[in-house]
């Protein structure tokens, strides 16, 4: 089978299409014929060595997949051969998503939403679970809450806006002028152009901030929260200074790293199938163009998600 392998850390050009053996499913696992694989910022960080989750190369990066069950091992009861599935298996261990086939624990996958084709389904798991686990599981966002989503035009942000709206929240978001119309179509009630306006002046009395940017943005987000507000960060999980400053103000600071979650995947699928959640693809490229997909991710300018198809 084909797989995108890297033999060293570095820029996008370290990614190369190779031939390798097809994996075999073990107890409680399924073999998935991958039809599409999502490309995420974490993939680029692993590729560069900035976040060495997978140790030293060689390895095949990628977690988001959508495809068809081709083989099941003993112990699998949730799926049958031919079922269409999607998920983010094994995170943070190696899943090898940039390939024609992957094996995955059956309980880390869910049935693909009927309303989505494989590329759109592959774009959903990591970004969608990050948003869901941050807003719903960690912060308990619900009706009447006032939520600020940073970088609303990005992969996580554009899904977070819709999830918060589906749960009855008022949503503010930061975005560039070029993405303002896009985030409004997702349901954002107020758009703050971070290039011309200080969000700390424009946003006040916020119940929950979802930080997808980190650094000074995370720290200054404390200024916009109500006295009992919550900052959920998906990039500053181990920032002791941020946590201490939040505690000093009586605020909650929660760090969230997405983990495989079939319940969350099913909840996301339900939102998709009811029309409350749509996945925006910025670029769809063939597996052989993985390096170009990473260049797009590294640019930081994509609106929505980047996906590889097999």
Spans of model-derived segments:
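A short acidic, Gly/Pro-enriched loop at the edge of an enzyme's catalytic core
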Residues: 201-208
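Glycine-rich phosphate-binding loop and adjacent beta-alpha segment
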Residues: 213-277, 310
């Amino acid at each position: 089978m084909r797989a995108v392998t890297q033999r060293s850390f570095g820029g996008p050009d370290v990614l190369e299409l190779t031939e390798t053996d097809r994996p075999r499913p073990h107890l409680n696992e399924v073999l998935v014929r991958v039809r599409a694989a999502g490309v995420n910022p974490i993939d680029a960080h692993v590729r560069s060595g900035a976040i060495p989750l997978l140790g030293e190369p060689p390895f095949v990066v990628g977690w988001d997949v959508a495809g068809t069950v081709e083989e099941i091992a003993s112990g699998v009861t949730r799926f049958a051969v031919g079922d269409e599935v999607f998920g983010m298996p094994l995170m943070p261990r190696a899943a090898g998503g940039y390939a024609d086939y992957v094996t995955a624990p059956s309980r880390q996958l869910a049935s693909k939403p009927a309303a989505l084709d494989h590329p759109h389904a592959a774009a959903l798991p990591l970004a969608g679970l990050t948003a869901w686990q941050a807003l719903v599981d960690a912060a308990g966002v619900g009706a009447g809450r006032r939520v600020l989503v940073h970088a609303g035009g990005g992969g996580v942000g554009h899904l977070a806006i819709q999830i918060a709206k589906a749960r009855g929240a008022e949503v503010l978001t930061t975005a560039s002028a070029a993405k303002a119309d896009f985030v409004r179509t997702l349901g954002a009630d107020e758009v703050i152009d971070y290039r011309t306006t200080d969000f700390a002046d424009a946003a006040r009395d916020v119940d929950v901030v979802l930080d997808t940017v980190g650094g000074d943005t995370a720290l200054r987000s404390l200024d916009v929260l109500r006295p009992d507000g919550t900052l959920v960060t998906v990039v500053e999980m181990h920032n002791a200074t941020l946590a201490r400053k939040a505690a000093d103000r009586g605020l909650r600071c929660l760090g969230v790293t997405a983990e495989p979650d079939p319940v969350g995947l099913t909840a996301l699928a339900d939102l998709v199938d009811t029309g409350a959640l749509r996945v925006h693809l910025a670029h769809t490229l063939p597996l052989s163009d993985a390096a170009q997909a990473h260049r797009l991710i590294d640019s930081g300018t994509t609106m929505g998600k980047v996906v590889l198809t097999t």
